[in-house]
Amino acid sequence: MGWRARSTLFALALAVCLAGLGVGRAAAAGGTGLFGATETRGDNLLMFGKWDGVLARMRETPEPFDDSCEGPGARCHLKEWNAFLLSIKDKDKMAQLEAVNDYMNKFPYIEDVVNWGKEDYWETPLEFLQFSGDCKDYAIAKYMSLRFLGWPIDELRLVVVQDLNLHLGHAILVAYIDGKTIALDNQIKHLINTQNIHHYRPVYAVNESHWWLFRS
């Protein structure tokens, strides 16, 4: 079973677990969230081990503004990422979203089993730049790019959705800007307001400080 199918099963299991623990009552009160769904928020990221692992590995990774191109092959990807981020750091926020989305979407889609011999592996941006990856890896690379550009944590979410057309799990990045929720999606060439997307049902979302579970 690939990640795209496993992601929905994980969310269902998580919902049952949270309900059994009463977390829905302890977490932030549910309100209307992404794609019109009701959302519940919590802050125990240890329940999202793959994402927590990415954050841990990121703390051990050189920041993109290290322009060295020596050592392992990934270092040159770091230098290229550095140059790209520096080229857009003074642009307005919408222009940054467009540039980051375009830059990362140029990489080919590659399943985890091809890259890593595993059905589910969450890459750091440096791993993505070196090997490319699947939908969640595009979203993570975009998330971290914007964080390095100075975007606050609370303006970004990595969102796992159910694609109602393909009947598969999918992952996107959502940015909150000027009262809008903008999707950065490797399956959609241009930025798009989530209000204009009707074939995604949100399942869960994470950033560095919180998780959200959605109910339609």
Which residues are covered by each model-predicted region?
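A structural boundary/capping signal
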Residues: 2, 22-216
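Bacterial N-terminal signal peptides
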Residues: 11-20
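Bacterial N-terminal signal peptides that target proteins for export
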Residues: 1-12
